[in-house]
Structures are given as structure tokens and as C-alpha cells.
A protein has these predicted regions:
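Segments forming oxygen-rich coordination pockets for charged ligands
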Residues: 1-137, 141-151, 167-171, 205, ...
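Short, ordered loop/turn segments at secondary-structure junctions
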Residues: 137-140, 158, 178, 201-205
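Conserved SAM-binding strand-loop segment of SAM-dependent methyltransferases
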Residues: 151-157
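Short amphipathic alpha-helix with an adjacent loop that forms part of the alpha/beta core around
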Residues: 158-168
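Adenosine-phosphate binding glycine-rich loop
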Residues: 176, 194-195, 200-258
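Rossmann-fold NAD(P) dinucleotide-binding segment
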Residues: 181-194
Length: 258
């Protein structure tokens, strides 16, 4: 209870501010009280909520003068003040009374094919902060209720995915129900700016798809963009295990980009 302010805690047994931790160290926490009268601050929170669905890089900026808030804002990349640019990274930073924290990162995972593996993959990715779009040409599958953790479900033809724009921040995961559809989607995805491209399948299937793409004019450099077979080699067999393997590779790719 009470107002806003800084509070320090000792993370090891002690007689002052002991919170029962045994790992050691110290943590300082800033508590921000929001009341209905703080209309400007409430507006910032509403902006924050609205921006989360816009697929943009988003940061919190909190500047303190002692324990008084000088500045409380939510910023996209284009709104970052030039003099504070060094504070806006992929990590939370506290320096000289200025605290910044990344709230959202641009980029979504587009899963082309919502079958058994796709359905298992959606909640795994959502739980590690990927925004997820599922794209399928089967009307019975392409329904939001089949993927409650997905941000978007699209019903469309695999031969024409032009309704989905892939940027350099996006992840394309190809796991359609057939070889022909995999080929069609890959041929289109390779012409996009997608930052990550992965395709499920056996090594034999991947080799045949690669041959077709090369025959169509794609280069070895183009195909080097494709993670295939997709996923880290953890000997996964079930859809749920494969989903973990795929998500792990995507997490690794995301971490290396930071």
C-alpha cells in the first residue's frame, strides 16, 4: 500500500528486508501506483495495450528524479529520443535514473499448415512470446477455435500466399500437408524478406524440393536461407516433441539476432 517509490531487498538471510531468498544478491524495485486521477499515465497504459497487437518493436521508458517520475512513456522504434538511443536494446537497462525495458519485438511466426505438428507448435511459440499466424487451405482447420493461442488464423490457397506479407522480422514455418504445397509455399517465401524460413520433412523430401527450386532458378544462396529439416536434432518423433524441436531452433535464431 502507499504511493510510488523505490524499494531495495536483500536476497540472502538478513535482519532487514529479508524476503526468504537463499541465492544472494540485492534487488531494487520501483513500485508505480496508478489511480483513476492519473489520466496521462492511464493513457500510456492504454497506448501500450493497443501497440502490442501492431507487430512493432516497443519499449517502456521510465525516468526518475530521485523517486519522482519525470517521464513515463511507451515508445516504438521511431519515437526513441536520439539522446537516449543507447538505452533501447533487447535487454532491460537501468542507468542514471533512466529505466528502459523491451515490451514487444516486431516479428511474427507464420505457420503454413495447421495439421498435427502445426497445432502442437502454436501454443509452444505463443508461450515464448512469438505472435503466431496460422495459414491453411483446409477450411475445416482454418478456424480460430482450433488454435486458441494464435493471434491470427488465415484460410487461403497455398499456391497464392500474397495475402501474407513477410518482413525481415518474420518467421516462416512451412509444414503443409503435401510435398507440392510445401514447394509452392517455399517458392513464394524465398521471394520474401522473411528473416527465418524453416521446412518440415525427411531429408529425401527436402532434397527433391531443393532440386525443383534450383531448376526454377533459385540459387544455392537462396536455399541456404532455409532451415530444413526444421528443428534442433533432439530425435523428436511425436507432434508435441517436434514442436519443441522447432520452437527451440526459432528461439535460438531469435536470440542470435539480438
Amino acid at each position: 500500500t502507499g504511493g510510488s517509490g523505490l524499494k531495495s531487498y536483500e536476497l540472502h538471510p538478513n535482519d532487514v528486508n529479508d524476503i526468504g531468498m537463499i541465492c544472494g544478491g540485492q534487488v531494487t524495485v520501483y513500485f508505480q501506483l496508478f489511480t483513476p486521477e492519473q489520466t496521462e499515465d492511464i493513457a500510456v497504459l492504454r497506448t501500450w495495450r493497443a501497440q502490442l497487437s501492431r507487430n512493432v518493436d516497443l519499449w517502456l521508458l521510465l525516468a526518475l528524479d530521485g523517486e519522482r517520475v519525470k517521464e513515463f512513456r511507451v515508445l516504438t522504434r521511431g519515437g526513441i529520443p536520439q539522446e537516449k538511443k543507447e538505452y533501447f536494446t533487447s535487454r532491460a537497462i537501468w542507468h542514471g535514473g533512466v529505466y528502459t525495458e523491451p515490451l514487444a519485438r516486431a516479428g511474427r511466426a507464420c505457420i503454413f499448415g495447421g495439421g498435427h505438428v502445426g497445432r502442437a507448435l502454436v501454443p509452444v511459440l505463443a508461450n515464448v512470446d512469438f505472435r503466431v499466424t496460422v495459414y491453411d487451405d483446409r477450411e475445416a482447420l482454418a478456424k480460430p477455435e482450433n488454435y486458441p493461442a494464435a493471434d491470427e488464423v488465415v484460410f487461403g490457397s497455398f499456391s497464392d500466399i500474397s495475402g501474407v506479407t513477410l518482413t525481415a522480422d518474420d518467421y516462416a514455418v512451412v509444414m503443409t500437408p503435401g510435398h507440392q504445397a510445401d514447394y509452392e509455399v517455399l517458392a513464394q517465401v524465398l521471394r520474401s524478406e522473411a528473416g527465418y524460413i524453416g521446412c518440415i520433412g525427411s531429408r529425401g523430401k527436402i532434397a527433391k524440393t531443393r532440386e525443383r527450386l534450383l531448376a526454377d532458378g533459385f540459387t544455392d544462396a537462396d536455399l541456404a536461407r532455409v532451415h530444413a529439416p526444421i528443428g534442433l536434432p533432439i530425435l523428436a518423433e511425436t507432434p508435441e516433441e517436434i514442436a519443441i524441436s522447432v520452437a527451440a531452433e526459432m528461439i535460438e535464431h531469435r536470440a542470435k539476432r539480438r
